[in-house]
Amino acid sequence: MRPNLSLSYQQHTAPFAMRLLSSLFALFLCGAFAIAPLQGQRKAVFDLNKALQRFEQQVKKGVAITFTLTSQGTKPQEGYTWLYGRRFMLSMPGMEVAFDGSTLRIINQSERTYTLMTPSEQDLTAMNPLAYIQQTSQRFRITERKSPRGTVVYRFVPTQGTNVLAGVKYYEVTFDQQSQAPKRVDLYFDLGEQVSYTIHKIQPKEHITSQSFTFAPQEYKSLEVVDLR
């Protein structure tokens, strides 16, 4: 049976991000940022288009990100991911995820499984939070929200007829006003749950090869292999 990587994301992220993260990549559902008209954007102070384009360029070259995942009723979890175009590697306590552009590989230590699958775009979106930053903005109604000093917050609400974020009512991205870098991603689910990713560091990821997005046999040799391709 194909695992459900969307909907009630929080239930699966609890112990070890079982729900298999957002981002993340995600990912990389977007190759270009076609920005829809923004409601209430302070263009003279902050340019959302430039902020998104800057992040996209970082991802194209390879970027490493450390973050903290928090959700209701669970302890905060530290995570690490690096993104390279559509490909990504994600590390959380008890779980490792890799996507090489075609095959999604998941090591789940709590269930002692190594899963391989050909993911849908929704599967990828459910895996990596930072993917939401890269979503094609034409699919969303974007509004600026009230924000703490030194930051800018935008809410992204899927337009009618789109189903990119299955189970997600809307999400918000907080940017640093000076550096224009994303600082936080908050996902608000239809059932009332909220999952937040606080980004601590974004830096270039060097020495990326094709082997960066897969696992060596010794990493999963003691696990049950579940091949869903």
Report the location of each language-model feature:
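N-terminal secretory signal peptides that target proteins for export/translocation
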Residues: 1-18
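Bacterial N-terminal signal peptides
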Residues: 23-34
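N-terminal leader/targeting segments and the immediate start of mature chains
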Residues: 32, 36-75, 86, 218-229
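Non-transmembrane domains of secretory- and envelope-associated proteins
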Residues: 41-42, 148, 159-170, 177-229
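Short, hydrophobic/aromatic-rich segments at coil-to-beta transitions
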Residues: 60-66, 84-90, 149-157, 179-186
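Beta-turn initiation residues at beta-strand->coil junctions
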Residues: 69-71, 92-93, 108-109, 186-189
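An acidic-aromatic
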Residues: 78-127, 195
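Flexible, surface-exposed loop/linker segments and immediately adjacent secondary-structure boundaries
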Residues: 119-150
